[in-house]
Amino acid sequence: MEKVIQILNQKQIHQKLERMAYQILEDNSDETEIFVAGIVRGGYILATRLVEILNKLSTQTFHLVRIELDKTSTRLKAETDRPLSDFENKTILIVEDVLNTGKTLTYGLGVFLNLPIKKIRTLTLVDRLHRLYPVVSDFTGLEISTVRHQYITVVLDEEGREDGVFLE
């Protein structure tokens, strides 16, 4: 039986999000509005929390967006809960909980690739550094080198009570 190790607790997750929020504001100081697009499920919960933090720190406008993916499809299947025309010439921040091979983040980016976008940035809570796809996280909460058979689990309670990041 594999040992489960908690690598981030609720307080640490919040601290990471707050630090990344300041980095986002610094990177986007000239923007009036930013679309924060969370990849369902964990990325969307993180995006929701991030928007709450950003709204406390800045007068800029932050729009929360949900990205739904079908990673089992042989063709890219991803969609947002807003019309794609809303994103034209705008700044988008794509949020994911764990960056492992890069497939999920690549699919999330794919939604916006045929649009005239001003700027796209990516944020991940945990980066495992096991890329199979050519993507990077612009804002990262924690980088951790793991072996392939290890697994990172991000537990995010919708109310933020029992959060944690675990290594198995």
What are these regions (language model features)?
Residues K90-K119:
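Internal catalytic or translocation cores that form aromatic/hydrophobic pockets or channels
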Residues D30-V40:
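Short glycine-rich phosphate-binding loop at a beta-alpha junction
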Residues I13, V36, I120:
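Residue-level signature of catalytic and energy-coupling elements of molecular machines
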